Amino acid sequence: MPESLVILPEFPQNIRVINQGEPDGQDWAFKITSSSGRDVFAVAISPVNNSRTGPTWSYIFDADGLTTVDLGTPNSFANLEKAYSRTGISVREIDRLIITHGHSDHDGTVPEFLSKSGAEFCAHESYSALKGFDQWDIQDRTSSPLQIELEQLGREKIDRNVYKERYELHEAYYEARKTTSVDRNLVDGSTIPGATIFSTPGHSPDQICVQIDDLILTGDHVLPEITPHPTSKMLFREDIKKSPLVEALSEEHLYGLGTYIESLGKVIALGEEVRLLPAHRLFNKGQLNLCGVERASDIVLHHQRRLERLYGHIGRGKSNLTDLTTSLFERSKLLGGNLMAALSEVVAHLELLDDVGDIEISNEGSMTLIDLETPRYVDFIQNIAIDS
C-alpha cells in the first residue's frame, strides 16, 4: 500500500487523497481511516457506458485478509483493475468479496473477479436465492389491481425493440450471474473480520450495509444527492415460489416502500457519530459527499412529502395510476425507459397508503380516500422516527 499520500486541507483529517480524478468522481481514490484506526480504501470504478449515478465506489479494507465491497458494472473489470492499482492492491490479493445487493452496477463483474482472485464470495441470503432470476420477471403481475395496471402500461408505452441492445446486455448479465456461487450467506447481524452486517431491504431485497467502526458502507441504501428507488410490494410467481431457496424468503419483509423506510430507520438509529460511505456520488461536482445519518432522515422526509402529494391528488379526484404519475413527475422524467421507473415508484407509494388504510383501491384500479382526521401514513413515519 502506498506510503506517500497527498493530504488536501479541504478534506477531513481522516481522509487522504490517493488519486485526484474528474469533477464527476471518475478516477478518484481515497484512504479513509475509521475511529479505531482501520484504513478503508475507496476507489471509483468507471462504468463502460455513461451512467446518471456516476461511477460505482468499491471499498477495500484489511482485517484477517483483504475484503472488497462492491465491484461495478458488466464489462468494467479492466477499469476495476486499473482503479485498484492506484492503491497498490491487486485483485489477486483480495481474500473476501461482499456485494451489497444484486444490481448490475454492483455485481456486474463478479464472475471475472472470482476467477482472478479466488476470493470468498459473501452476500445476503436472498441474493443466493434470487440471483438466477431476472428481478423484473419474478413478480406475479396479477397480484393486485396496481400491478395489473403497471404491467398493462408497460406493454402499451414501452417499445422493447427500441431497447433491444439494452435487453440483450441485461440478459447476458443474468446468465453470467447464474454461473457464480455464494460461499457465505449473510443475515442481519452477521459478522466478518473487521465488520458487522445490517440487512436493510427496500431498494433491493438483498440490500445490506457494512459497518466498519464508525464507517457505514451503505451500497444504494442511502445515497447523497439522489434518492434510491424503492421496490414495490412483491408476490412471487408460483413457479418462482417452488424454488427451494426462494420458498424460505419472506416477500413481505424484503420488498416495498414501508420496508425501505423501516430500513432507513435502522440507519438513523446508529446515531450522529457514524459516517456513511455510499456506492455512488461519494465525490461529485468537485466535492466530497461525506454524509451522516441525517441523509437517511432526509430520504424519509422525501417519501413523506411524496405520500402527502399523492394523498392530496387522490383527494382532488385523480384516481388512476397514469394521472397520478403525470401529476407527480415532470415530463422529462416520463420519457423512454424512465416511464416504468416513475410508474413503479408511484405504485410503491400507493401500496403503502393502501396498507396503512388511507386509501381504497377498487378491482379496476381506481382510488378513493378513506375519510380520516389524520392520514395514517403520518403515524407510520412518526413511529419509525420515534423508534430510531
Map each language-model feature to its residues.
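Divalent metal-coordination and catalytic microenvironments
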Residues: F61, D70, L80, H101, ...
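Short Pro/Gly-enriched beta-strand edge/turn motifs at strand-loop
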Residues: G37-S46, R166-A172, P193-A195
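Metallo-beta-lactamase
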Residues: N75, T196-S297, L301, L307
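Active-site HxH/HxHxD metal-binding segment of metal-dependent hydrolases
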Residues: S4-E10, G54, S76-A78, S85-S190, ...
